[in-house]
Amino acid sequence: MKIYKLQTPVNAILENIAADKSISHRFAIFSLLTQEENKAQNYLLAQDTLNTLEIIKNLGAKIEQKDSCVKIIPPKEILSPNCILDCGNSGTAMRLMIGFLAGIFGFFVLSGDKYLNNRPMRRISKPLTQIGARIYGRNEANLAPLCIEGQKLKAFNFKSEISSAQVKTAMILSAFRADNVCTFSEISLSRNHSENMLKAMKAPIRVSNDGLSLEINPLKKPLKAQNIIIPNDPSSAFYFVLAAIILPKSQIILKNILLNPTRIEAYKILQKMGAKLEMTITQNDFETIGEIRVESSKLNGIEVKDNIAWLIDEAPALAIAFALAKGKSSLINAKELRVKESDRIAVMVENLKLCGVEARELDDGFEIEGGCELKSSKIKSYGDHRIAMSFAILGLLCGIEIDDSDCIKTSFPNFIEILSNLGARIDY
């Protein structure tokens, strides 16, 4: 895919940003904890979340779908499927399903694409094995495909050494099948969509005031079925916020965006860098929702070292902002970037250099010198949707060819359509 330099300003109101991926995954998986029909409007129709629907279908759920409205009728009992459960490119789907299936009697095989099957799963499989789960796979159950033989699990008191919503949610799901009360704690607060949704479903879970500790009781009855409207994804919206900032005389308003405090850290970073950006809350139900207004801005360099778990998905796009800011910027304490869909530290630095930007890898992040003269280049996405979309936005300034853009469909199927509607010229 080739993105040509955009010569005109962008002025738009965007209401069709992709639905939130994290909430879509959880809606589908958590429906298996109920016994009645679950309904979601604005479900994300991307490859990752459609794969999750297929997984729960193979576990016995009945699914009705009309456009982005999805109804799920859970099975009375989870089936032991006669096929591999394909998670595609989604680490969220795989890690959450490991936790869910570990305590269900049956035999299950989870696999994914070539990128997912090389991402670390021991952070989930190890603590589950310690409480009685039987999980088998390459490199001591660190790499998929993974085979899970569901067992009754022992209660646990688990302290996570990493701040990860995926680890947290997997352990919560396993705790529901344990033989007694379980506790979970983490070193810093990760995304809390699971807690928010499960509390709305009347799950037997208690959260400490600071959000760092959980007490989870085994399930004694089905949870309350869901009927929700899924807001739009702030991680997906971020690309078009960035576009408005870097393109002269541009302004964009984005509506129905999820504004959960654990999801807007990257927006706060842009504000600290000088971006003219406002977030307004319009609804506060089980999640905080609102609109974002942003316009062309001059950015200044910044050091980012806190709340990294809250901006891990936006880090590649933030690197683009760093490259266009005045002065040096850095991101540290972000070693988790090395085990995402790609090694995002290495890949961002490699590709930014190809575009004429001075960038340097750190063990746990990167340093970028802003204000370099950009040049048109061909970059590699390494199958990582966030790398591809970040450089597509940079391409609006200098023109860029991206070697694998199909990966964008895993999270944001109408990204190219929106980009084209804003005036971008795109060739395949």
From Swiss-Prot:
Entry keyword set: Amino-acid biosynthesis, Aromatic amino acid biosynthesis, Cytoplasm, Transferase
Residues bound to phosphoenolpyruvate: K21, G91, R119, Q166, R344, R386
Top-level EC class: transferase
Reaction it catalyzes: 3-phosphoshikimate + phosphoenolpyruvate = 5-O-(1-carboxyvinyl)-3-phosphoshikimate + phosphate
Coiled-coil annotated residue ranges, if any: none
Domain of life: Bacteria
Listed GO biological process terms: amino acid biosynthetic process; aromatic amino acid family biosynthetic process; chorismate biosynthetic process
UniProt-listed Enzyme Commission number(s): 2.5.1.19
Pathway per the UniProt entry: Metabolic intermediate biosynthesis; chorismate biosynthesis; chorismate from D-erythrose 4-phosphate and phosphoenolpyruvate: step 6/7
PROSITE patterns in the record: EPSP_SYNTHASE_1 (PS00104), EPSP_SYNTHASE_2 (PS00885)
Chain sites annotated for binding 3-phosphoshikimate: K21, S22, R26, S164, Q166, D313, K340
Keyword Transferase recorded: yes
MF terms in GO: 3-phosphoshikimate 1-carboxyvinyltransferase activity
Localization (cell): Cytoplasm
Function: Catalyzes the transfer of the enolpyruvyl moiety of phosphoenolpyruvate (PEP) to the 5-hydroxyl of shikimate-3-phosphate (S3P) to produce enolpyruvyl shikimate-3-phosphate and inorganic phosphate.
Complex formation: Monomer.
Record-stated family: Belongs to the EPSP synthase family.
Name of the protein in its database record: 3-phosphoshikimate 1-carboxyvinyltransferase
Organism: Campylobacter jejuni (strain RM1221)
Taxonomic lineage of the native organism: Bacteria, Pseudomonadati, Campylobacterota, Epsilonproteobacteria, Campylobacterales
Originating gene: aroA
